[in-house]
Amino acid sequence: MYNFIFKKASSKEEMEKSYAIRTKVFCEEQKISKEIEFDNLDHLCSHFLIFDDKKVIATARVRQKEENILKIERVAVLFEFRRLKVGSTLIKNIIQYFINLNENISFILHSQVAVADFYESINFISYGDEFFEDGIPHIAMKYIKTKT
């Protein structure tokens, strides 16, 4: 049984764990260079983690684009924890975290085309044309709030 815990990164150690996951997923698995992955925007972002017990297994960062628009970026889940709803747990908790602070907030992201259906399953819709980012096909997506 898994015990996933959501947390906003708040220490240097947690940030290092976030960076380690991004390095493993993006640099090692997807062959994106570290220079591209670590783009000097991290200091402008809020970083979030999912723990399984005491091990960090997923991460994402969130950056303000406009007054009420946040961009979810660098979503990464360790390989052995994919298909266990870790990614959706991470994204849903990020959205709830910021909506609790400002109910008028909107969310956008650039999804790799290969995983756009994952984001569609958690109420994101695509808009615009496909484009390449770091040599990988992407599509812009925005979150559609559901009425509660």
Which role fits each region the language model picked out?
Residues 1-12, 147-148:
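Conserved N-terminal entry element of GNAT/NAT acetyltransferase domains
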Residues 34-60:
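Conserved beta-hairpin
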Residues 49, 55-64, 68-76:
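Conserved beta-strand in the GNAT
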Residues 77, 83-96:
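Conserved acetyl-CoA-binding loop-helix of GNAT-fold acetyltransferases
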Residues 91, 98-111:
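Conserved GNAT acetyl-CoA-binding A-motif
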Residues 112-113, 132-148:
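C-terminal "cap" of GNAT-fold acetyltransferases
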